[in-house]
Design a protein with these regions (language model features):
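Outer-membrane beta-barrel "beta-signal"
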Residues: 40, 45-47, 153-168
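Transmembrane beta-strands of outer-membrane beta-barrel proteins
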Residues: 42-46, 76-78, 106-110, 141-145, ...
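Residues on the lipid-exposed face of transmembrane beta-strands in outer-membrane beta-barrel proteins
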Residues: 43, 63-67, 77, 91-96, ...
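Cleavable N-terminal export/targeting peptides
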Residues: 1-36, 168
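Repeated loop/turn-to-beta-strand initiation elements of outer-membrane beta-barrel proteins
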Residues: 39, 71-75, 101-103, 136-142, ...
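Solvent-exposed loop/turn segments connecting transmembrane beta-strands
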Residues: 50-58, 80-89, 99, 113-124, ...
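Outer membrane beta-barrel
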Residues: 105-114, 119-121, 128, 133-145
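Short glycine/proline- and aromatic-enriched beta-strand/turn motifs that initiate or cap beta-hairpins
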Residues: 31-79, 89
Length: 168
């Protein structure tokens, strides 16, 4: 079924809906007032694909937000250009209960869209193993994206993040 509006408008609306959902969740989940030191601005991704011969885009520019609820949980949402050179949006929650030195280990669970071979570009759920390093104003999320047959190509993805106030 084709929508009577341009695809960019639909994707833009999706991101607005995702952002609104994240903000509502942040508001409802907050035990205290907003703490700027818990807010990260995330860049897109650099993805080292396991199928390097498929002509996939490794540089995935984008912009997202991540808000740490506590030492183990954080919420995230954003938009980027995916490996198929399409616009994608995401929304999710990190759960990282394990520490290995300076690394936090766990998973991010959530939903993505924009992959033409996965659910016709629509939203789909994902559970992805992650590691995070954070120090002062800078951090790095590393995700092991599993392949999904011929629908989604696997990769080791790196996401830089920045916060204006260090803390937590």
């Amino acid at each position: 079924m084709k929508l009577p509006v341009p695809p960019d408008l639909v994707l833009g609306s999706s991101l607005k809906a995702v952002s609104l959902a994240l903000l509502c969740t942040l508001g409802g989940a907050a035990k205290a007032e907003f703490d700027a030191s818990r807010l990260w601005v995330n860049a897109g991704f650099y993805s080292a694909h396991f199928d390097a011969d498929k002509g996939l885009r490794n540089a995935n520019p984008g912009l997202g937000l991540e808000y740490a609820l506590d030492e183990r949980w954080s919420l995230t949402a954003g938009r980027f250009i995916n490996s198929n050179d399409r616009n994608s949006s995401y929304v999710g929650a990190y759960y990282q209960p394990w520490q290995l030195g300076p690394l936090k280990l766990g998973v991010v669970g959530g939903a993505f869209n924009g992959y033409p071979n996965a659910f016709n570009g629509g939203w789909f759920p994902a559970l992805i193993p992650t590691a995070t390093y954070e120090s002062g104003h800078w951090g790095l999320n590393v995700a092991l994206v599993p392949p999904l047959k011929d629908r989604l190509y696997g990769a080791l993805s790196f996401q830089l993040k920045f916060r204006f106030q260090s803390g937590l």
